[in-house]
Amino acid sequence: KMSLVTTKKMFEKAFEGHYAIGAFNINNMEIIQGVVNAAKAQNSAVILQVSKSALKYAGPLYLKAMVDAAVAETGLDIALHLDHGPDIETVKECIAVGFTSVMFDGSHYDYEENVAKTKEVVDFAHSHGVVVEAELGKLAGVEDEVKVDAANATYTDPDQAVDFVKRTGVDSLAIAIGTSHGAYKFSGEAKLDFDRLDTITEKLEAAGFHNFPIVLHGASAVDESSVETCNKYGGKIAGAKGVPNEMLRKAASKAVCKINMDTDLRLAMTAAIRKSFGEKPEAFDPRGYCGDARKLIQELVEMKIKDVLSSTDSMK
């Protein structure tokens, strides 16, 4: 019987191969199927991740059962990951259900407390064979539970990153280099601090952390065609702006092994459903419009896997 995997091997291959694995936020069956169908078509490993509010919305047992079904159906390497775990209780709940990877987000605590709390999570998770992602430096924007205004967003300090990894034993690190959560990422021109990313990687390498995987949060491109479709069919999404795909591609070719996307899936799903409602006002079978949403999510994720993550054929 196929079962879920951790991200350990995935990230080793991704680092060596200069690509990244997509981590897609899931909330329901159609999103799971859209993402996994895309990964299967591209023969790519994939991370399905669940935020605290997704746990509340769908229930951990339903989400786990659907993801198990995806593994059984596709035979792909799939990791089930807790995104932005706010506390050790949530981490423990997810590990008990069978998640293979957890993120503890202590970035809103002061540094020493973040270290202490993260280490506690790492010790518990590792004793259960589960890998841990942590975050250092705050990302601006809004995503589910996470709200940080741009003025309070800080870039990750490279020396602190090394100290943090040393003292906590985390398996991967989410850093702040200019991305932000939500659909409104940049008011001006999009900029990512690649020099900072390189410095963090070099310093980790020098400290004995070989090929240490870096994670990029808030990395939706905010696809214009989805926004246009939403607005054409009655939506009001103004001024949305994401991270250009070519910047993400560059990050994936460096130490970034995991790129998180949530907003893009939300927009695609909403665009497909609005279009369906607009074009077929007489229809009322949810399988019609939910099926359209699943199909558009698959197309979007296939494009991401091919052109942004470059993780096509990573199952080989």
List where the protein language model places each region:
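C-terminal alpha-helical cap/extension of soluble enzyme domains
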Residues: 232, 243-316
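Generic N-terminal amphipathic, Lys/Arg-enriched alpha-helix
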Residues: 6-22, 283-284
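Alpha/beta enzyme core
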Residues: 5-13, 28-54, 60-77, 85-213, ...
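Short catalytic/ligand-gating loop segments at beta-alpha or beta-beta junctions
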Residues: 216-221
